[in-house]
């Protein structure tokens, strides 16, 4: 939970009081950056919950296809697995060429990782299984090249992506979108914030 992660950081950095902890958060940008990196959860995988992606491809993409330009926002994109998963399916549906995928996160460190389009090769077997279960049409390995222990995803996918920091709670929407995906972050918000 969020409370547990904050308490862990508070104890780890041995603050004598919450007031001192709060003071550092407010007055030291470098500590605020550390705080954000420590409390955000960035565990995700490609085609996580394959049935979701199957429905996205089968039921949502035909509606998106009616738009001249498709704008999709991946809010809380973490290290980018979900946005790359969506790009792959858009390409297979012949929709990527007219799409822009906006990938945002509060944590600039994970955004940098996401923008590289490089993932651990050890996860590709699981991602490939998820891809097939999600209704993927091709060999999953055609979307990346293996180099040492890394899978480097094709630049044709990331060329349709825009990466930026964004705080869902305090920042406004920056465009109009046909689809907003925030599956990685909604679980952390209370009911009032979700609305």
Positions of predicted regions on the chain:
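Short strand->helix junction
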Residues: 42-46, 79, 170, 187-188
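Short helix-capping segments at alpha-helix termini
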Residues: 92-97
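Extended basic-aromatic, gly/pro-enriched interface segments that bind polyanionic ligands
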Residues: 99-181, 185, 190
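Conserved AdoMet
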Residues: 1-73
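Conserved hydrophobic residues forming the short capping helix/wall of the S-adenosyl-L-methionine
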Residues: 10, 90, 118
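Conserved class I S-adenosyl-L-methionine
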Residues: 67-85, 99-102
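Short, well-ordered amphipathic alpha-helices
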Residues: 55-60, 83-91, 115
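Short alpha-helix of the ABC ATPase nucleotide-binding domain corresponding to the H-loop/switch region
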Residues: 191-195
């Amino acid at each position: 939970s969020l409370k547990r992660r904050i308490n862990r950081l508070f104890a780890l950095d041995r603050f004598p009081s919450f007031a001192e902890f709060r003071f550092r958060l407010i007055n030291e940008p470098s500590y605020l950056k550390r705080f954000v990196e420590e409390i955000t959860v960035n565990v995700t995988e490609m085609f996580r919950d394959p049935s979701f992606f199957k429905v996205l491809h089968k039921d949502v993409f035909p509606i998106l296809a009616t738009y001249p330009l498709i704008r999709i926002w991946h809010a809380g994109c973490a290290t980018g697995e979900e946005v790359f998963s969506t790009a792959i399916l858009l390409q297979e549906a012949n929709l990527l060429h007219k799409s822009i995928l906006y990938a945002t996160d509060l944590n600039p460190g994970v955004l940098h990782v996401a923008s590289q389009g490089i993932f651990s090769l050890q996860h590709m077997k699981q991602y490939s299984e998820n891809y097939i279960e999600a209704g993927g049409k091709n060999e999953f390995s055609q979307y990346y090249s293996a180099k040492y222990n890394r899978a480097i995803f094709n630049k044709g996918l990331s060329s349709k992506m825009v990466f930026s920091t964004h705080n869902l709670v305090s920042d406004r929407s920056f465009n109009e979108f046909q689809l907003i995906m925030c599956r990685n972050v909604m679980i952390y918000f209370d009911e009032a914030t979700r609305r």
